[in-house]
Amino acid sequence: MDNKINHSSRAVAAAVGLLKIFNVPAVVLQVCEEALGYAKRLSKNHTNQKLWQIDVSETMFDSKIGKYRGGLELMAALGYESASATSRFLTLRGSVGASKSGLSKSVLTSVRRSIMELTQHTNGL
């Protein structure tokens, strides 16, 4: 379990670092805040299956997160991953096979830890 925690922390830190390298500070803050919004909505409404998947071609997502270098990496650090290089959807890790009653405790714990980590980075911007 500790290895998962360390990996998650490193992934968030690496994604924020990538954002900082390739974008101006205002963009970094915007992307982090938007990503936090997605993760917090998921954490609060984990039974809402619509939140388990993000359409990266959606204009709102693309304009606020997807078009910036490091944005998709940040979403991956928060638990969303692409099924393939050509997929237009990011799917929450661990959501496949989840029941309508919600995500597993381990998936929720991972998302919440990532939220805390990203919040710390965002507060430091």
Regions found by a protein language model. Give the residues of each.
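Ubiquitin-system adaptor modules
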Residues: 1-125
